[in-house]
Swiss-Prot record:
The lineage of its organism: Bacteria, Pseudomonadati, Pseudomonadota, Gammaproteobacteria, Enterobacterales. Consists of a catalytic RNA component (M1 or rnpB) and a protein subunit. Its EC number is 3.1.26.5. GO terms for cellular component: ribonuclease P complex. It catalyses: Endonucleolytic cleavage of RNA, removing 5'-extranucleotides from tRNA precursor. Keywords: Endonuclease, Hydrolase, Nuclease, RNA-binding, tRNA processing. This is Ribonuclease P protein component. InterPro entries: Ribosomal_Su5_D2-typ_SF, Ribsml_uS5_D2-typ_fold_subgr, RNase_P, RNase_P_CS. It comes from Escherichia coli O157:H7.
Length: 119
């Protein structure tokens, strides 16, 4: 049985871990959201989230975006390559409803899977 938990090992926690991804990322994006990824040597994917107050004013909207992104990652973690991902929310992401945001994330996860197979 596949575990769909979201333990601490699957998160980017320190600034150096984020910097590692920002140095040489593979990018996949939409006008509202970008996912940066970089291969890691851990054997499993990890995720970090950046939702700036400048782009999404209200705290409950930022929390909704982060919650939906974490849930999308949690459900797809076993299909994703061993990469560190940073999800960057841009202006306009707060205008997406839950379904549109989930569909955009699914499309970007699939694109990263293709990019990882190609490299």
């Amino acid at each position: 049985m596949v575990k769909l938990a979201f333990p601490r090992e699957l998160r980017l926690l320190t600034p150096s871990q984020f910097t590692f991804v920002f140095q040489q990322p593979q990018r996949a994006g939409t006008p509202q959201i970008t996912i940066l990824g970089r291969l890691n040597s851990l054997g499993h994917p990890r995720i970090g989230l950046t939702v700036a107050k400048k782009n999404v004013r209200r705290a409950h909207e930022r929390n909704r975006i982060k919650r939906l992104t974490r849930e999308s990652f949690r459900l797809r973690q076993h299909e994703l390559p061993a990469m560190d991902f940073v999800v960057v929310a841009k202006k306009g992401v707060a205008n997406l409803d839950n379904r549109a945001l989930s569909e955009a994330l699914e499309k970007l996860w699939r694109r990263h899977c293709r990019l990882a197979r190609g490299s």
